[in-house]
Amino acid sequence: MTAASRANPYSIVSSEEDGLHLVTMSGANGFGNGKVHTRRRCRNRFVKKNGQCNIEFANMDEKSQRYLADMFTTCVDIRWRYMLLIFSLAFLASWLLFGIIFWVIAVAHGDLEPAEGRGRTPCVLQVHGFMAAFLFSIETQTTIGYGLRCVTEECPVAVFMVVAQSIVGCIIDSFMIGAIMAKMGRPKKRAQTLLFSHNAVVALRDGKLCLMWRVGNLRKSHIVEAHVRAQLIKPRVTEEGEYIPLDQIDIDVGFDKGLDRIFLVSPITILHEIDEASPLFGISRQDLETDDFEIVVILEGMVEATAMTTQARSSYLANEILWGHRFEPVLFEEKNQYKIDYSHFHKTYEVPSTPRCSAKDLVENKFLLPSANSFCYENELAFLSRDEEDEVATDRDGRSPQPEHDFDRLQASSGALERPYRRESEI
């Protein structure tokens, strides 16, 4: 079989690039490992950092008819200026339509002739031309009621048209108010106050490599039944040679144990344990520098005020995942309450003792974990640096700082670990 016959007409890459994918995407577990390291291909983000999906629809059959068939959803989804323009045109069209009808009735009844030549009661009083008929239409639909123009019993058709215009006006008003209230009450804007960390990190947690990212709520109102989920999106070539440009793979964030449901009062670090079932099981730090994938993270819940479901989204490319880093603490106990410092929300500090190999190599005992004392030492340094900042602030207020017995005890217990004291941001 020739190369031309193997070419996929639906593939977005050339046949040479297909061959490259076959080499770099194969692995023992289907997700990586055993790769030939090449330079990273520049890929487009599928989900932007602000949650918008980077897609564009094209060649849709009967798009206008389908959108008009669901007019209410169309009005809710479009921008405010377009929605207000549509309703303004709807009002003008209805006023103009019934104005023309009343003018035609007046012409047919002879109401536009001079008063001395008529000799009978007009259908609509004080309507002597099209402009007067148009004003009468506006007064009828908006119930202004100036009192100069009114319909008489002379023409039943005119009475029927007044009733019809009143019904049409109520329908337009109801539709407009409903669409505006639905648009204003949408929980979409609630996602603007739900925050994701700029980067995700990979570090050890309880002796296992874990992928972590941080979420936060900028409002005091809660997100009811908040839960998170994540998906890994990457191109893949099947065993039959089919190229899938955006293959979606679920990432477990503790669904079976209920860990995906969170109480989002303070910022929380979401954790994905990189185990045998993880798509990141065979990826090491070196693989992370050359791999081509995107992790989409989703936070869902109900808005406390309206009980409507909202969804916040973000994503992390491979170069936005920091290997061997941890997030700086943002929650501190202060007097009789807890203080959340969002200036540290996106900040991380490096943990040099994090293994550079993949989780698969760790399971196969190809990497010797450092002693637990080293991790404890780094964690205590991080918190002691925070205590030092509190003591400096206390000294500025004129109160004597507390003695630094904790740090002396740490230096005495560290033994062979002769490291100089550094601030948290330098770890």
From Swiss-Prot:
Residues 393-409 have a biased composition (Basic and acidic residues). Disulfide bonds join C123-C155. It is a multi-pass membrane protein. K(+) 4 binds at G145, Y146. Its main location: membrane. A motif (Selectivity filter) lies at residues 143-148. Keywords: Cell membrane, Disulfide bond, Ion channel, Ion transport, Membrane, Metal-binding, Potassium, Potassium transport, S-nitrosylation, Transmembrane, Transmembrane helix, Transport, Voltage-gated channel. The keyword Disulfide bond applies. Homotetramer. Forms heteromer with KCNJ4. Can form heteromeric channels with Kir2.6/KCNJ18. Association, via its PDZ-recognition domain, with LIN7A, LIN7B, LIN7C, DLG1, CASK and APBA1 plays a key role in its localization and trafficking. This is ATP-sensitive inward rectifier potassium channel 12. It comes from Rattus norvegicus. The gene is Kcnj12.
